[in-house]
Each structure stands twice: as structure tokens, then as C-alpha cells.
């Protein structure tokens, strides 16, 4: 499918040159042929997108936790929470492992999982990581389940086409198309560790935990939030971060991170002069935690 898409994009470039050719240089009857070729090109590109959607949707599940946000959980004002009791996830192994958002799972004792064939299963929580807003669930089925593979989010580029699939407002496996608007987004007050992919693919309450696919059908992100006072600004956790968290959650049910045990602040020129530090590089240790 990737070779087919490259060929279509190459043809699109040629067709663009045809349309931009001066009118007085065009031969009689050339315009109808160009229009016919252009329409055929668009239809073929559309077929690529629809094929991708049909391939990707079966791995996406709808989640219905009993207590999605948990008791006393604060939600950042920038994040629009899920519709009550709903969210999305994506199956990542044929054995039934599902990755989703931690804020979708919350403190739920059990989570109902609705598969693409409308069958329902109860999921067990394998592990959660609030610092990245990720969680892993496990369902047991009597058959191998359709699943999606992770892609390499380090190769994601701005302008790349992406598909978001989720459960907005309970509308299961809704597909939206967009582009990558930005990468490496930080300081958006959504989680402790932030390195988000920004996209304009439509993401709404209930999309949380659903996958962001590239045109190969690979997961490049886990949709997590939108800006509540803007349109077309959504964020996804990069797949490479998700894979690192996933490995620890599968092995030990939690993520273990190093802790230095000190508080630091930038070493400003004023502080450097005060402490007699000749260099103005580095940081100042201002607190030690026992």
C-alpha cells in the first residue's frame, strides 16, 4: 500500500503541473483529459484511505469503565474529559493486550471492552502509569484478536497524513483524517512527561486512548487530549514512549524511574557572582530530599 501511495502522490505532482500550465499553451481537448485523470487520481487516493480505515478499525475497541476518572482526580483545564463512562483503546497483541489512557481507566475495578464485532469482554488492568497517562489492559478471548503494530514515532514528520480512530460521544470506531501539525510538544499541562504529537485530525471526548495511525496502518500515537478552547488541536502520546512504558507495565505492572533526590534551579549570572562560581553553566542545587 505504501508503494501505491507513493505512486499516487507522484502522479498528483505531475497533474498539478498540468493544471498550472499556461492556458494558451494547452492543446485543444487537453483540459477534459486532465480533469478525467485528476478525478481518477483522487478516487485512487480515496481508495487508499478507505482501505486503511477498514484495516485499522478492527483493532480498535470501545471501553466502558465503572469509574473512569476515579475519586478526587483533578483534570487539567486544557483537557476535555471523556464522555461519561466511555473511551477507546487499541489491541496490540493477538492475546488481547490493550493500550489506552490512564485517565480512561481511572480507579475502575472492571472495564467492559466492546470489540469490533460487537461482542463484549471484561478487561483486567495489567498496569497504569499516571505520569504518561498510559494504561495496559488484558482480555481473554476464545480466538486470536485483530491487533495493530506500533510504528516508529521518531520518523514522524510535520505534514504527514494520519488517521485517528476512537469512540467520540459513544460513536464507536469513528475515523477522522488529518495531518501531523507538530511534534515534540511540551509544556501543555497534560501529564508529567510530555513529548506529544500534535494533529488536526478531529479528536473529541471519547477518543481518548484510541490510536493515531500512519498511512501504513501502524500506531504512531495514542490520542490523549484536545485543547478545550480551540479547534483542530489534539495531542497524542508518541508510540516510542508508549512502547517503553508498555514493556515495564507488562513486566512489573508499574513504571520505575530514577530519582535524584535534589531540587535544582538555573544558575543565573547573579547567583554565579554571589557564590563565586566562575562559569555560568549548570544548575544550582537548592534543596536535598531525605
Report the location of each language-model feature.
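Sec/Tat signal peptide C-region and signal peptidase I cleavage site
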Residues: 21-24
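Bacterial N-terminal signal peptides
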Residues: 8-17
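Bacterial N-terminal signal peptides that target proteins for export
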Residues: 1-9
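Intrinsically disordered, low-complexity proline-rich regions
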Residues: 16-19, 159
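Serine-dependent protease modules
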Residues: 26-290
Amino acid at each position: 500500500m505504501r508503494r501505491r501511495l507513493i505512486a499516487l502522490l507522484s502522479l498528483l505532482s505531475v497533474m498539478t503541473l498540468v493544471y498550472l500550465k499556461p492556458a494558451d499553451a494547452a492543446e485543444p481537448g487537453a483540459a477534459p483529459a486532465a480533469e478525467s485523470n485528476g478525478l481518477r487520481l483522487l478516487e485512487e487516493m480515496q481508495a487508499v484511505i478507505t482501505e486503511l480505515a477498514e484495516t485499522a478499525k478492527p483493532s480498535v475497541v470501545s471501553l466502558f469503565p465503572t469509574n473512569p476518572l476515579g475519586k478526587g482526580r483533578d483534570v487539567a483545564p486544557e483537557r476535555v474529559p471523556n464522555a461519561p463512562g466511555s473511551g477507546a483503546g487499541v489491541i496490540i497483541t493477538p492475546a488481547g493486550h490493550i493500550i489506552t489512557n490512564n485517565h480512561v481507566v481511572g480507579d475502575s475495578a472492571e472495564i467492559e471492552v466492546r470489540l469490533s464485532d460487537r461482542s463484549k469482554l471484561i478487561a483486567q488492568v495489567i498496569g497504569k502509569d499516571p505520569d504518561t497517562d498510559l494504561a495496559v489492559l488484558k482480555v481473554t478471548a476464545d480466538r486470536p484478536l485483530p491487533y495493530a503494530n506500533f510504528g516508529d514515532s521518531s520518523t514522524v514528520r510535520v505534514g504527514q497524513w494520519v488517521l485517528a480512530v476512537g469512540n467520540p460521544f459513544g460513536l464507536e470506531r469513528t475515523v477522522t483524517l488529518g495531518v501531523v501539525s507538530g511534534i515534540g510538544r511540551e509544556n501543555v499541562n497534560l501529564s508529567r512527561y510530555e513529548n506529544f504529537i500534535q494533529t488536526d485530525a478531529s479528536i473529541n471526548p471519547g477518543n481518548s486512548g484510541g490510536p493515531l495511525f500512519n498511512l501504513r496502518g501502524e500506531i504512531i500515537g495514542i490520542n490523549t487530549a484536545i485543547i478545550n478552547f480551540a479547534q483542530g488541536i489534539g495531542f497524542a502520546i508518541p508510540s516510542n514512549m508508549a512502547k517503553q512504558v508498555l514493556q515495564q507495565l507488562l513486566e512489573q505492572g508499574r513504571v520505575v524511574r530514577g530519582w535524584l533526590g535534589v531540587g535544582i534551579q538555573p544558575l543565573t549570572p547573579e547567583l554565579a557572582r554571589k557564590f563565586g562560581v566562575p562559569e555560568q553553566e549548570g544548575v544550582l542545587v537548592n534543596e536535598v530530599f531525605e
